[in-house]
Amino acid sequence: MRNIKCGVADIRKRVFAEVAKLAYEGGDYTRIEKLPYEIIPGEIGRQRESVFLERAIVGERIRLAMGLPLRPVTEHSLLSDGVEESAIAEKYYDPPLINVIKYACNACAPTHYEVTNACQGCLARHCQHACPKGAIRTERGQAVIDQNLCIKCGKCKDACSYQAIIKFTRPCQEACGMNAIGQDEYGHACIDYDKCVSCGMCLVNCPFGAIVGERIRLAMGLPLRPVAEHSLLSDGIE
């Protein structure tokens, strides 16, 4: 989230700093393979269950920062693959602008309503009576929502005297004003590029930093170019 210090922003800044440093030092692209180890040192992962997973994710962030596409998860390739084609004087970004690193995604559950342990199993059963679909029943003295029947109207949440029902939202999905975020068969976020306008709201709202964008000029310390004017990607690099 914006204006709040977080680990995602720290990693993002470190990736951009290293890519910018690489460019200003003359572009020794053999160093690219070492960058994930410099950004994530040591033997133990700090943010995720494995240091190898952290480095793999950072590697994809490095590629996107340099204007390179994500690598297929099912194929072996070097981190630097394709860098020669990208390191040219004139280059416009290759779509898509917003990408999902699938193995960085937490596969959050879709937006739904959930009964917490704050439920008192009251006699009034306001939530049950408020539900227009009969999706709420009582089990072991507590309310339970049948997700197959629930239409996510939120009436049960409003009716509960104990605020025991919460709306669980998938941050990226909730932030998208175009309803362009879905999920694949593994529950990972996926973007419908026919709807996506590349606003970046999903990017800044993903707590796991799984959604990233191509930011070649920003990574090199250059300002964004005016949308209404033609300019080269390399303008101002000298």
At which residue positions do the language-model features occur?
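Ferredoxin-type iron-sulfur electron-transfer modules and their immediate structural context
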Residues: 1-175, 179-185, 209, 215-235
